[in-house]
Design a protein with these regions (language model features):
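N-terminal accessory/interface modules of nucleic-acid-binding and processing proteins
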Residues: 1-191
Length: 191
């Protein structure tokens, strides 16, 4: 709200995400352009990836000004334009401003890279290496990630463009699109 700029209405922001979802799924080229944005903002939700893509398709590693200024050894440059995303606060969707890493400058000797392996996550990565897939591990609620993924797949198929295909093929097609999209994003990240 600085400089008297009011935050946009969460309903308007959600509508922008819906419009963007329609646009990015309209053609393979539009989807590839969206995947570029998603690959550089993989830490956030699909909804927020859509919002970032709609406002700044070239944005990378978007985070709040507080994160950049206080934790990442970076400062947001004066005059940088924020990107509006949605987050839930006590169950209510609220607008939140984030900035691309390209809108920041280094303030110290060492920058905290958003994708680097830190001591905090190293044990989890080692556990994944020794145990294999996390898909069969249970969450705090006693539900495996595989079960959760299956529920997400089922709800993603409902009311989607996959209605043209045979019901037995819908899940396979969606999984294939997700797998190919993930591989494409990995290739983008690897250069």
């Amino acid at each position: 709200n600085r400089k008297g700029k009011a935050m946009p209405n969460p309903q308007d922001i959600f509508q922008l995400a819906q419009q963007t979802a329609t646009q990015v799924t309209a053609s393979p080229e539009n989807w590839r352009r969206f995947l570029y944005t998603a690959a550089h903002n993989y830490h956030t939700t699909y909804l927020n990836q859509l919002l970032i893509h709609a406002q700044r398709p070239d944005a990378t590693a978007c985070a709040t000004m507080k994160y950049w200024n206080e934790q990442a050894h970076r400062k947001v440059m004066y005059g940088s334009k924020s990107i509006i995303i949605l987050q839930r606060y006590q169950g209510v969707p609220t607008a939140k401003r984030v900035f691309s890493m390209t809108d920041t400058v280094l303030t110290g000797d060492k920058a905290a890279a958003p994708w680097e392996v830190t001591d905090a996550i190293r044990p989890l990565l080692m556990q994944v290496n020794s145990v294999g897939s996390l898909m069969d591990r249970e969450t705090e609620q006693g539900v495996s990630l595989s079960d959760r993924a299956n529920r997400v797949l089922a709800t993603s198929i409902e009311d989607s463009a996959l209605n043209w295909s045979h019901p037995e093929d819908q899940r396979f097609i969606l999984q294939e699109v997700a797998a190919q999209s993930t591989l494409y994003m990995i290739c983008i990240r690897l250069g």
